[in-house]
UniProtKB/Swiss-Prot annotation:
Belongs to the eIF-3 subunit M family. Keywords: Cytoplasm, Initiation factor, Protein biosynthesis. This is Eukaryotic translation initiation factor 3 subunit M. Residues 42-61, 418-468 are annotated as: Disordered. The lineage of its organism: Eukaryota, Fungi, Dikarya, Ascomycota, Pezizomycotina.
Amino acid sequence: MPAPTTTLLIEGTFTELADEFAQYIDALRKNEGASLQSEIAPLIEPLRQQEQSEEEPDRKQRDEVLKKLVGAAAVLNAAPEKEIISAYNLLVHLVHQASNPDMFLSRICTYLAKPITTSPQFGPTLAISILSTIFNTLAPTDSSRFHVLLAIVAVIRQSGSSYAFEALKPQLAAQLPTWLSAWELDDEDAQKLHLAVADAAQASGDLELAQTHVVQALQTIPANESSSKEARDLAVRALTSALKSPGVFDFTSLTAADAIQALRSSDSTLFELLEIFTADTLDAYEDFIAATPLETISGGVLADGAEALQTKMRLLTLASLAASTPSRSLPYATIASALRVPVEDVEKWVIDTIRAGLVEGKLSQLRSEFLVHRATYRVFGEKQWAEVQGRLMVWRRSLESVLGVLRTERERYIRESMQAAAEETGQGKSGDKGAKGGDRRRNPQQQQQSQPSQPQQAREVELVGGAE
C-alpha cells in the first residue's frame, strides 16, 4: 500500500538499461513482429555517445526511446511470475528519466490494471506491489499519483479482495483529503476517484464506505451541471443507495447537494420519497406507497428494497415519536400503534432503534413503557426550536422552585441561629448576676456544679436550631 516516498536503485546507464529491456521484450514476444531492440538501436546511439562524452543527455531523444519501450510493455503481463516485478521496476526506472514521466506512467498503470495472465492467483497482489512502488517513487505533490491510485483501486475492485481493500482503507481515511488537495485535481478527476473507491468498497462488502464516497462524488458536481444526465444518474444512485442502506438515517448531506435538488424536476416521486424519509412517519410512507408503487419510481431502482425501506421507516418513526414526547415516557401501546406492529413486538423494535443510534432509554416491562433518555431529531426547524424552548422553560421553572426552597431554608436557618445566639447571651448575663449574689451562701463545689448547666442548655438549643 502507499507509503513514504522511496527510490529505485538500479545500476547502469540509460542506453544500457533500455537495450536490456528491449531484449527482454523481444524474448517475451518470441520473435513475433519486428525486433524492438533493432527499432530503438538508431535512437539510443546518439544517447550512448552523449553518455560516453559525459554530455547532458537529450531528454527528447530519451522520450522517443521510451515511447517505443512503453508501447511494447503490455506484454510484461505475460512474463513469468518471478520476473514481473523486476521487469516493471526496470521500466519505471527508465520512465523517471523522461522529460515528463507522467505521460508514460498513466499508460503503465493501465497495463497493471489488466489481468496478469501468467499468475491468475497472485496477479492482483503482484500488480498492487508494483503500483505501490510506482506511487512511492513519486513526490507527494505529483499529480501522477492520481493515476497510480486509480489503478490500485481498480485492481482491488477487480480482484474482490476484502483483505487488500482493508489494507488500503487506513491510507484512504488518513491521507485521501491531503492527496486531493496536493494534487489539485479538478472536479471531474476528484469525482472519478471517489467513484472508483466507492466501487471497490462495494465489491469488498463495505457498503457504508461506498455510500460515503458516492456522496462525496456527488458533491463535486458544479451547480450549473446539476441537471445533466450524468449528474442525474449519480444523484439517483446516491439516493437509492442511501434509502436502502441499513446504516444511513441522516439525509442532510444528500438534500444539500444541487444534483439531488434537481431530482425534484426529473424524478419527482423519488425526491418526494426522500422528503418522507427526511421528516415524515410510517403513516405518510404507507400512503405514498399505496399511491405510488416502488416499481414505478425512477425506473424501478427501489423495486427490490420494499422490506428494507419499511424497516428503516419504522425505526425513523420511533425516533420521531421519542423526540416529540414531552413526558419522555412512551407506552408500548402508543409505539405499537405508530409502527403498525403487535404490542409483543414493541421491545424488538425499540432495541433495533437503540442499536441504530437513534434513541437511548430503558424498557420497563413492569409498566409496559419505554423511558426515553435521548432521541435524535430527524429535522430541526421552527417546531423543534419551540419544543426545546418549552423544555427549557419547564427546566427553568423547576430550578427557580428549587432555588426558592433553598433560599427560604437558608433564611430560616439564619433567623433561628441568631435567635439561639441571643438566648444564649441572655442566659449568660442572668447566670453572672446569680453567681455574685450567692457566693457567700454556696461552697466552691456547689458553684462548680451549677455553672456548667447553663452552657449545656445553650448547646442543646443550638443543636436543635441547626437540625431544623
